[in-house]
A protein has these predicted regions:
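Short, basic/glycine-rich phosphate-binding loops at helix/coil junctions
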Residues: 29-35, 80
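Short, charged N-terminal helix-start/capping segments
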Residues: 11-21, 47-58
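Compositionally biased amphipathic helical and low-complexity segments enriched in hydrophobic
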Residues: 8, 127-131
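Conserved serine/cysteine hydrolase catalytic core
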Residues: 48-51, 55-120, 124, 128, ...
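Helix-loop "lid/cap" segments that line or gate small-molecule binding pockets
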Residues: 35-44
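Eukaryotic N-terminal low-complexity, Ser/Thr- and Lys/Arg-rich leader segments
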Residues: 22-23, 131, 135-140
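Flexible "cap/lid" loop of the alpha/beta hydrolase fold
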Residues: 1-29, 64-65, 98
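Short glycine-enriched loop/turn motifs at secondary-structure junctions
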Residues: 34-36, 111-112
Length: 140
């Protein structure tokens, strides 16, 4: 499915798919299977944080990913954007992040040496970048 992260390096059966509209329709949400989560999502997190994150993780709605649009000139362009790259991300690779930045350019780009979950693996670095980003944006 276009727009869904390619995790084929980890095998063919990485996702638990939910079929909210019945199994004769496309899946409505997905969740990375338990046995892959630490390796893919939380490889830079402590075991304790990885366990906590696993308890909090919920299925992601596929339509939100598949239906995302980046229309130029729409009212949403008036909202300042920043992008924080997660350099060690195994879900959305740095190359994919660069493509996202190019497709819908933000005001500023920051980087954090983190996996897909910087709020667990690098919370203080993430906080510092959020403060820096907030200070750099014009007041509304």
């Amino acid at each position: 499915m276009q727009g869904v992260p390619d995790l084929s390096d980890y095998g063919e059966d990485v996702y638990d798919l939910q079929f909210g509209n019945g199994t004769d329709h496309l899946p409505t949400s997905a969740l990375i299977k338990t046995e892959f989560r630490r390796k893919i999502l939380y490889h830079m997190c402590s075991q304790e944080d990885s366990n906590l994150a696993a308890l909090l993780l919920k299925p992601g709605p596929l339509q939100a990913i598949l239906g995302a649009k980046f229309d130029q000139g729409s009212p949403v362009d008036a909202v300042p954007r920043i992008f924080i790259k997660t350099v060690q991300d195994r879900v959305i690779t740095p190359e994919q992040q660069d493509a996202m930045i190019e497709k819908w350019p933000p005001e500023n780009v920051y980087s954090v040496d983190s996996d897909h979950s910087p709020f667990f693996s690098a919370p203080f670095m993430l906080l510092g970048l959020l403060v820096k980003a907030t200070a750099s944006l014009p007041t509304i």
